[in-house]
């Protein structure tokens, strides 16, 4: 592969074919491309605008080079992040509820733009985020839940970490995380940081062999189901792509004040989640339930979103016991108990 020719193509705003993008991504991730050229390619892709074929090619390369585990019929709730509002880690909380009814392979990382990433909040709850593949399979078998830390399961990504940090801008790698689950999760609720990216990412997801993935962008600009207004979504299945607009009132609830969902740290997020599980924070509980409702719809466990909300309302009653089971199997229960005490006031 001639990297300089690829760069010229991108500078001329020509899209790469899937196989070109895949081979390019493999070369970059393996560390075979000089950093100065990696920087140029990532910036050229961003300036041109990443195409569907490029996202699919890069995603396939990342999947191939990842440490893989087999979790049949798993669901993931990973989103792109990057909304900048710093809301509570609702996708992680939803993953805990979902593990009551389905295997969950939660792919995630530390915070990039927010105050708390999924890895950060799980650590705050006492979870051991470094889980080797054999242990991961054991945890899924016993608890229906495992966290797959992106930095651990995509070790070759260290070869581009310095370039990404130095550039300090969003690159194609920022939007690949949710599409590169090491367990090859066939079901997903995927938050998207920009409404403009819904169409592109849904078309990319359609090429990546999901059974069903629902991509969401919520008002006022979050990569979650909206707590205050409309959620714009793309439902991607083997049958094609369906566009849906959902309002928070469609769940049968009133809008949730966004300021009640903001967190200052991973511990703050952990406390809010546990308070919701204890029945002491109605606003966060509602936020968790509406996101869980859409994930349940992705799993075809419910016929519509209102039914999903009612199911989630039932599941949240068992959520603290489930969280305790998850931490007991792979973490520090004393740390969780400390969070529970702080949440009980």
From Swiss-Prot:
Instruction: Tell me which EC number(s) this protein carries.
Output: 2.4.2.18
Which InterPro entries does the record associate with it? Anthranilate_Pribosyl_Tfrase, Glycosyl_Trfase_fam3, Glycosyl_Trfase_fam3_N_dom, Glycosyl_Trfase_fam3_N_dom_sf, Nuc_phospho_transferase
Outcome recorded upon mutating residue 164 to A: Strong decrease of the affinity for anthranilate, although only a moderate 7-fold decrease in catalytic efficiency
Enzyme class, one word? transferase
Q: Biological process GO terms, please?
A: L-tryptophan biosynthetic process
Q: Where does Mg(2+) 1 bind?
A: 91, 224
Q: What is this protein called?
A: Anthranilate phosphoribosyltransferase
């Amino acid at each position: 592969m001639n990297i300089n020719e690829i760069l010229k193509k991108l500078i001329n705003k020509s899209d790469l074919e899937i196989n070109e993008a895949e081979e390019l991504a493999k070369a970059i991730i393996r560390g075979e491309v000089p950093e100065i050229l990696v920087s140029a390619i990532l910036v050229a892709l961003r300036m041109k605008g990443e195409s569907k074929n490029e996202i699919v090619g890069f995603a396939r390369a990342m999947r191939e080079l990842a440490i893989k585990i087999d979790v049949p019929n798993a669901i993931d709730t990973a989103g792109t992040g990057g909304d900048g509002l710093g809301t509570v880690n609702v996708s992680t909380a939803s993953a805990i509820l979902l593990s009551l009814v389905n295997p969950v392979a939660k792919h995630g990382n530390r915070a990039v733009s927010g105050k708390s990433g999924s890895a950060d909040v799980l650590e705050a709850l006492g979870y051991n985020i470094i889980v080797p593949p054999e242990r991961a399979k054991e945890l899924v078998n016993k608890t229906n839940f495992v966290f797959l830390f992106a930095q651990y399961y995509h070790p070759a990504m260290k070869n581009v970490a310095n370039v990404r940090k130095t550039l300090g801008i969003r690159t194609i790698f920022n939007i690949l995380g949710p599409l590169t689950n090491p367990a090859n999760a066939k079901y997903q609720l995927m938050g998207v940081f920009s409404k403009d990216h819904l169409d592109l990412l849904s078309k990319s997801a359609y090429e990546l062999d999901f059974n069903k993935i629902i991509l969401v962008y919520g008002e006022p600009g979050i990569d979650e189901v909206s707590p205050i207004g409309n959620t714009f979504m793309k439902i991607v299945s083997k049958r094609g792509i369906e566009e849906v607009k959902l309002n928070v009132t469609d769940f049968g609830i009133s809008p949730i004040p966004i300021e009640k969902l903001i967190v200052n740290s991973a511990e703050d997020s952990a406390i809010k989640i546990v308070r919701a599980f204890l029945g002491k924070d109605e606003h966060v509980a509602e936020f968790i339930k509406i996101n869980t409702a859409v994930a349940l719809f992705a799993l075809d466990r419910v016929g519509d979103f209102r039914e999903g909300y009612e199911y989630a309302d039932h599941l949240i009653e068992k959520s603290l016991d489930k969280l305790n089971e998850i931490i007991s199997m792979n973490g520090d229960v004393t740390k969780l108990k400390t969070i529970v005490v702080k949440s009980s006031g």
